[in-house]
A protein has these predicted regions:
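Membrane-interface helix-loop-helix junctions at transmembrane boundaries of multi-pass membrane enzymes
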Residues: 225-233, 322-346, 455
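Membrane-embedded helix bundles of polyisoprenyl
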Residues: 29, 117-134, 140-222, 234-254, ...
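Active-site lumenal/periplasmic loops and adjacent helix-entry segments of GT-C-fold
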Residues: 36-172, 196-203, 283, 294-307, ...
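Contiguous transmembrane helix-bundle modules in multi-pass membrane proteins
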Residues: 185, 204, 335-496, 744-791
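Periplasmic/ER-lumenal interhelical loops and adjacent helix-loop junctions
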Residues: 52-64, 96, 232, 239-329, ...
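Extracytoplasmic/lumenal acceptor-recognition loop(s) of multi-pass membrane glycoenzymes
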Residues: 86, 466-492, 503-575, 613-675, ...
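Active-site-proximal, structured, solvent-exposed surfaces of multi-pass membrane proteins
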Residues: 10-14, 60, 657-791
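Hydrophobic alpha-helical membrane-insertion signals
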Residues: 3-4, 9-86, 483-523, 527
């Protein structure tokens, strides 16, 4: 308590305590991860967590670090191939935290993940403090509110997603800059932080824009913002300027997203107004009272969209008691209105989706913004001694009652499959543990309120110490549930990815282009090998991949996972080797797949070669129309596409004379033996050489007659092609792949990739930065003149 007292001995006024908050949050975050780093370190591993953190974040950061340093625009290791900017701008391209890691060798990146996480916690706490100190009179309580934000349930939960914390960390600075611009007429910072937040993550920025509108309207309606036409115009200018400065990645992302079916998923009928399950409402309600469970688990409720949604507004120790008190005693304050509006938004699907461009997929990944306001409201009320004596006790009693009411779900009789059990929770022990920890926080807060008078001036320090200490405890519980819940599954993660990559690359040939398959292995193995792998986990790959895969029997949402039974896809996509973890060999053998021969092995993998491998780039003797292809089942589509090239009616008119129309008899010959013959035919028609580059690819072809050459590369507007130096039309065939017409004889084919819209985006951004620099210089000069005139 002495340490806390020294840190908090100064009250309102004086110099900023930003760095005190920063280092407190950094230290607690470091302590939070330290035990798990030690456990992983004893196994000779870097810290790995679970789910998306392992499958995406570690591999993305490592791969992107190396890719950026080597330069280029097209990533062959991303699924079937995708533009780097479009594939990774949602995850890391604009993140200042990612750019910091570029100071390190890419091989060190996995070990940099925890320091970066600690930095994000610290930056989040520091930013929250800077924003809150305007509204919280006592600096000591500003520190408490900032630490509540830094270690809120939302922040701890989203360690799982890592890059979400970038948004949590940077948002408070933009909100502070808005307050400064309106209330103090300090205009320089707001465009800068708008640009930083937009550049950091365009998707989350859309939600931030909605929240800022809510915040702005409530502040004006509540009389805190005194608005006139001149000020409104200045804010509009700064907003547009900030968006222009930060739009470097926006246009390419927008051009890609409008083609992505995951982003175009509107509501229908009742879906606008009510969730499909009553349990969704209960889950939202209890997310304010119970510490968050692991993102990939369901416990208290089984129906509804609950996993991976970031649905939590839990605050350590204080819970939502401060928000309840604030809304009762300061109901006309803008913060009370903001929290009430956000509460309504959370319970109405279409309003919830405003933060995600009206997409009907449920997420709660905007909760960090009202949580920030909730933390400020808590700090503002805790500094009032009279409220701690009266209102807080009642609010805490209500919080305790609501938290304990969840016990009903653990005790209600439940009949399933003729057997009656007690409770409907999926894992009773885990639920009781979560409840116990949540109630421990309630109990600690009760003790703090009970001894408030005895603590007197040390009360803020005591609350801060308990909040940080309890954050460590509940954070450990959450991290442990999440990490060790998949401990067995992820036991070999480091060995079979980063550690095994050099051994695999030493065995696999590199003299010719081919793709890999990875049978039931860890996600994104191809990134560690820097090779194209048809098993891939990324939500924002080239949109044509999401168009192509469903037509050939592969569900493509966030993953590409073609089943082993779809053997014909391996030929179509030039898959030469399948990597099978040794512990999965029995499952692999049960598939009874023909045409695969064991050719090598490494410490963890057996390597099977595809005897029906077809090199990249080949031609056809036949084509099939879209109408005829629609009669083919998804499971047989790959077989048919090895026989014929799928063309639109317009393409048939232009290129139909080069090939014959596939007959029904030929279309129905889809046995394995037919597939082998088709692979042989395609192999004989393949280009003589194919070279993948970081800006596209080149190929050499020797054709007997003019024909379309298919490359199983996802179609992208960023590609241009030349054949023998002459610009050629890039055709979109096979529902998402690329082809180009080549003449008879020898041809040199060059495909060059430029990220569509990137040049224009960067130009706008650069121009806006120049305008911003001039504008800031003018503001600075004007300020100096005013100061000199006053002097």
């Amino acid at each position: 308590m002495k340490i806390g007292g020294k840190l908090l001995e100064r009250k309102t006024g004086g110099r900023s305590r930003y760095w005190q908050v920063f280092w407190l949050c950094f230290a607690v975050a470091a302590a939070l991860f330290l035990p798990h780093c030690i456990i992983d370190g004893l196994n000779g591993d870097f810290f790995h967590y679970a789910g998306d953190f392992n499958d995406q974040q570690i591999s993305f950061y490592s791969y992107a670090n190396n890719f950026v340093k080597q330069g280029g625009g097209f990533s062959w290791a991303t699924d079937l191939g995708s533009g780097f900017v479009n594939s990774y701008s949602f995850y890391l391209c604009g993140s200042p935290f990612f750019w910091l890691t570029l100071l390190l060798p890419y091989r060190w990146t996995p070990w940099a993940m925890v320091p970066m996480l600690c930095l994000k916690f610290a930056v989040a706490g520091g930013g929250a403090y800077l924003w809150m100190r305007r509204w919280v009179k006592d600096e000591r309580w500003s520190m408490v509110g900032a630490c509540l934000y830094a270690f809120s349930g939302f922040t701890v939960y989203n360690v799982f997603f890592n890059h979400f914390l970038d948004v949590v960390a940077l948002f408070p600075y933009m909100l502070k800059a808005l307050d400064d611009a309106v209330l103090d007429r300090r205009h320089g910072a707001f465009p800068f932080w708008v640009a930083v937040n937009l550049l950091n993550n365009y998707f989350f920025f859309a939600g931030q824009a909605v929240f800022l509108i809510i915040y702005f309207v409530c502040m004006v309606a509540g009389g805190r913002y005194k608005l006139n036409l001149r000020l409104f115009g200045a804010l509009a200018f700064q907003t547009v300027l900030g968006c222009c400065m930060g739009c470097a990645l926006l246009v390419p992302a927008a051009l890609s997203l409008v083609q992505n079916p995951r982003t175009i998923d509107p509501f229908n009928g009742y879906g606008y107004l009510v969730y499909g399950s009553a349990q969704q409402y209960l889950a939202i309600f209890y997310s304010a009272f119970l510490m968050p469970d692991a993102p990939y688990l369901k416990d208290l409720f089984q129906e509804g969209i609950l996993k991976h949604t970031s649905m939590t507004v839990y605050l350590p120790v204080v819970g939502i008691a401060g928000g309840l008190v604030f809304c009762r005693v300061r109901r006309r304050h803008p913060f009370a209105r903001i929290m009430k509006v956000c509460l309504i938004c959370a319970f109405v699907p279409v309003l919830n989706s405003m933060f995600y461009a009206l997409n009907s997929s449920y997420y709660a990944r905007w909760y960090y913004m009202p949580v920030l306001v909730l933390c400020a409201a808590t700090a503002m009320t805790l500094q009032k001694a009279n409220l701690c004596e009266t209102e807080y006790r009642r609010a805490l009693g209500l919080v305790a009652l609501c938290t304990l009411s969840s016990i009903a779900f653990a005790l209600v009789p439940n009949e399933k499959d003729g057997t009656t059990t007690i409770g409907v929770v999926e894992e009773p022990l885990r639920y009781w543990g979560i409840l116990l920890v949540s109630m421990l926080g309630v109990g600690l807060f009760w003790l703090l309120l009970h001894y408030r008078r005895q603590l007197a001036a040390r009360f803020p320090a005591a609350v801060l110490a308990v909040v940080l200490g309890f954050s460590f405890v509940y954070g450990q519980v959450h991290l442990s549930i999440t990490k060790y819940g998949q401990w067995y599954h992820d036991a070999d993660y480091v060995q079979q990815t980063r550690r095994e990559a050099p051994e695999l690359n030493a065995v696999l040939p590199d003299d010719v282009f081919y793709r890999l398959d990875a049978y039931d292995s860890y996600n994104n193995l191809g990134l560690w090998l820097d090779k194209s792998c048809i098993q891939f986990f990324n939500s924002t790959v080239a949109p044509s991949i999401l168009e192509f895969y469903p037509t050939v029997g592969v569900k493509r949402d966030v993953n590409s996972k073609p089943e082993a039974s779809l053997y014909a896809l391996r030929g179509l996509l030039s898959v030469r080797y399948t990597l099978v973890p040794k512990e999965k060999v029995e499952d692999w053998e049960k598939e009874k797949l023909e045409g695969w021969n064991l050719v090598s092995s490494t410490t963890s993998y057996l390597i099977y070669e595809n005897e029906n491998w077809v090199p990249m780039g080949f031609t056809y003797d036949s084509y099939i129309t879209e109408e005829n292809f629609e009669t083919v089942s998804d499971t047989n589509a790959g077989n048919v596409l090895m026989k014929a090239l799928l063309l639109t009616d317009e393409q048939v008119e232009r290129y139909g004379q080069m090939m014959q129309n596939l007959t029904d008899d030929e279309k129905n010959n889809i046995s394995y033996e037919d597939y082998v013959q088709d692979c042989t035919a395609r192999r004989e028609s393949a280009v003589t050489s194919f070279t993948a580059t970081r800006t596209g690819f080149t190929a050499q072809a020797d054709l007997e007659a003019e024909n379309l050459v298919l490359f199983s590369v996802p179609y992208d507007d960023g590609f241009t092609a030349t054949v023998n130096g002459v610009p050629a039309e890039v055709e979109k065939v096979d529902n998402g792949l690329m082809a180009v017409a080549a003449p008879a004889g020898h041809s040199e084919i060059v495909f060059t990739y430029h990220t569509a819209g990137l040049r224009q985006s960067v130009a706008v951004s650069a121009g806006a930065i120049v305008v911003y620099a001039v504008w800031v210089a003018v503001l600075h000069r004007k300020k100096r003149r005013e100061e000199s005139s006053v002097g």
